[in-house]
């Protein structure tokens, strides 16, 4: 099937080919990408986007490499970019050298061009699907976001292209591209120092009260829950703009997006000095630091927060231990 032109195949042909390749795979692929180029290198193939779990607990080695229709290997490391090794399918090229090391493959001129071509084709396909039927793309987002986010982290060219179709869902079920999100939130969510703050939650139920505090002020709260999102936020924040992500439970919302408004404490200094040691005696000193602040009357009297920087560093260390397909490189 991969040696035929796309014009000679219909959707049923691709479905049957996928079932033939993976007879034990009960779920159909989400969509496919047909590769067909003969200059400056020769490459044919069909790649399928499977439905993936957000956990990244999945197998690679699902893309089969052929040379002139003769099976060679299902290990395409060094040929196909890391983030695309989660796809399934077949590639066939006589221009890929065999019996060389991974470093040798990565240094080979033809392999570099093939890898770049595959990345571009995938990005173009995703952009086309987004433009053609955005509603359907949004429905599929949770099943494909890990691949896209991983690609944005590992491939700068893919990152630039993905800005047009990568989505940022909110806790109320809306989806925005990055540019749409920035435009919608820049006025309300810019603090007194000119920092544009994007608020997010990782768990709607566990962080419900914090989300309510933020949405009550008219702020958008994103729902970002993939295992590599901390890495991606770090990369976006490093883009040179005065923009940062803050999880809703990192502090009181008025501290996350500080405005010029000043809230006057209803407690005197003496009352504060009396109350603080009472609270400190009730919580483990090794775990919590007690801080008394003036807040608006709608706020809960007690809040437990974890500073954004500390929590994010822990999350990045946890996902960067080398157990997630090379994520230790980030």
Language model segments and positions:
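Conserved GHKL (Bergerat-fold) ATPase module
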Residues: 1-330
């Amino acid at each position: 099937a991969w040696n035929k032109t796309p014009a000679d195949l219909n959707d049923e042909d691709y479905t049957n080919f996928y079932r033939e390749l993976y007879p034990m795979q009960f779920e159909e692929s989400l969509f496919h990408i047909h590769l067909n180029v003969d200059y400056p290198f020769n490459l044919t193939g069909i790649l399928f986007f499977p439905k993936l779990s957000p956990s990244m607990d999945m197998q690679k080695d699902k893309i089969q490499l052929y040379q002139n229709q003769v099976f060679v290997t299902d290990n395409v490391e060094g040929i196909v970019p890391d983030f695309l090794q989660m796809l399934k399918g077949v590639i066939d090229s006589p221009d890929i050298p065999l019996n060389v090391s991974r470093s040798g493959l990565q240094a080979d001129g033809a392999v570099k061009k093939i890898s770049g071509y595959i990345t571009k084709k995938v990005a173009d396909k995703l952009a086309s699907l987004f433009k053609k039927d955005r509603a359907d793309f949004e429905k599929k987002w949770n099943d494909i976001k890990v691949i896209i986010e991983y690609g944005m982290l590992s491939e700068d060219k893919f990152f630039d292209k993905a800005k047009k179709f990568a989505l940022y869902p909110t806790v109320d079920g809306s989806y925005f591209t990055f540019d749409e999100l920035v435009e919608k939130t820049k006025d309300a969510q810019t603090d007194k120092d000119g920092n544009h703050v994007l608020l997010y939650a990782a768990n709607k139920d566990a962080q419900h009260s914090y989300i309510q505090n933020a949405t009550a002020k008219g702020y958008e709260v994103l729902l970002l829950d993939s295992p590599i999102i901390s890495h991606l936020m770090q990369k976006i924040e490093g883009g040179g703009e005065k923009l940062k992500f803050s999880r809703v439970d990192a502090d009181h919302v008025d501290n996350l997006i500080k405005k010029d408004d000043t809230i006057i404490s209803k407690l005197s200094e003496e009352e504060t000095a009396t109350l603080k040691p009472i609270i400190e005696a009730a919580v483990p000193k090794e775990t919590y630091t007690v801080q008394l602040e003036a807040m608006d009357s709608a706020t809960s009297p007690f809040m437990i927060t974890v500073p954004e920087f500390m929590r994010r560093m822990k999350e990045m260390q946890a996902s960067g231990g080398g157990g997630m397909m090379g994520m230790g490189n980030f």
